Amino acid sequence: PTAAPPEETKPVQPAAAAKKETPAQPLEAQENASEKKIGINLASRILTLYEGDTKVKMYHVGVGKTSTPTPTGYYAVQYKEVNPTWVDPDDTSVQIGPGPSNPIGYRWIGFSGNYGIHGTNHPESIGGYVSNGCVRMNEADVEDLYQYVSVGTPVTVYYDRLVIDVDPDHTVSYYVYPDGYGWQSLSVAQVKKALAGYGVEDFAEFQDISDKINASDGNVTYVAKAYDLVVNGNKLAKRALGKNGQIYLPSVAVATALKLDLQWN
């Protein structure tokens, strides 16, 4: 059988060949010129790199075990390190330098005390609740992420089982993830309310949503395409919806905006 991977901890000192990047001034005084930021959803176990509000990269990650969950909150990258040395959290005299035996891989992106984003020599653990609270990434992924972020890059860690996406073609879709930490119950009414914010709640049937919550498999559910409606220069609160090649208009809202007498035949 394969031995369990050693538990990670922040390297207390860099290896001889390590390259370390630390802030030259307080984090609040630094400007993030690229406007890049990191979002980590513990429920989906996905790390997203944003530029402004645009998603530019998404990576699967491993996060804290149920007994040692990754803390949620608002943070910032505090320091970065190439070729970190792993230090045994139970015996600091035990250390593993850079190389294939190092459980935190070849990159460390610290964002809060002992917590950081790092590589791993156990890629099979990615996607699970596996760590002492750090965020594990596949080595190729963390090396990719490392080049895009800098000290001061904002890091938001959160736990959302329901994720709603809007594609460039206006398609609204949602995902329901399992409650790995047991932190967040989810009801049909909550999903409906969230979809209402995108104007597509009427195209999501009660039973379909209930089935998705019961499955909690993280698979995508496409709802409808949503388009803004402008009448006489005014954007309506209701939206035009597209489904199966058909466009549906909110007739009452359009008639009211046009000051027409709407009659049903």
Regions found by a protein language model. Name each.
Residues 2-28:
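Low-complexity, acidic Ser/Thr/Pro-rich repeat tracts that form intrinsically disordered stalk/linker regions
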Residues 33-35, 42-45, 56-58, 72-74, ...:
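Extracytoplasmic
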Residues 43, 73, 141-145, 187, ...:
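Stable alpha-helical elements in mature extracytoplasmic
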Residues 53, 83, 161-164:
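Short, charged beta-turn/beta-strand-edge "cap" motif at the junction between a beta-strand
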Residues 208-265:
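Primary recognition of N-terminal secretory signal peptides and signal-anchoring hydrophobic helices
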